Amino acid sequence: MDSHSIDLLEELVIASKLLAAAVLGAVVGYDRERHSRDAGLRTYASVCVGAALFTSIAGHLEDVSATSRIVANVVMGIGFLGAGIVYKDSNSGYAKGLTTAATIWCTAAIGVAVGLNMFVIAIAGALLAYFLISLHHRKWYVRWKHRIKQPRNVD
């Protein structure tokens, strides 16, 4: 066996990380899937798995600094994906896709955390991201958002 190969047990550990990343990414994408958004469960799970895979592979390279370079490139790649998602709505003049881009970026970070064996951080990140995505369906949040956007009378 050459120095670049890993044994079957290590490959199974990486495979279990990928499964964990898929589940966590799916958790983040669930609310979007439920409300028929373009980027949903499959997109978020795929981003999380990809980030975990790149990071896990980097952990087995001989060059220790390769991990940080690969993580940086994952962030950059997701940035390009996010840039393609954000657009300006010609009717309203508002930017669209910002939340999608931000949560896809966050989901990549969750995948990186899984790839680096930071499972508690990954789970906390996934749950927090899901909560933030689902806020716009909460009545209290909608009322609060509407209230703060109302102009105040200044006498």
Model-predicted segments: where are they?
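Short, amphipathic, aromatic/basic-enriched membrane-interface segments that mark the entry/exit
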Residues: 36-43, 88-99
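Short hydrophobic alpha-helical membrane-embedded segments
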Residues: 43-48, 74, 96-105
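Hydrophobic, membrane-inserted alpha-helices
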Residues: 25-28, 103-111
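Generic transmembrane alpha-helix signature in multi-pass membrane proteins
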Residues: 55-58, 82-87, 106-115
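Membrane-helix boundary connector in multi-pass membrane proteins
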Residues: 93-94, 108-122
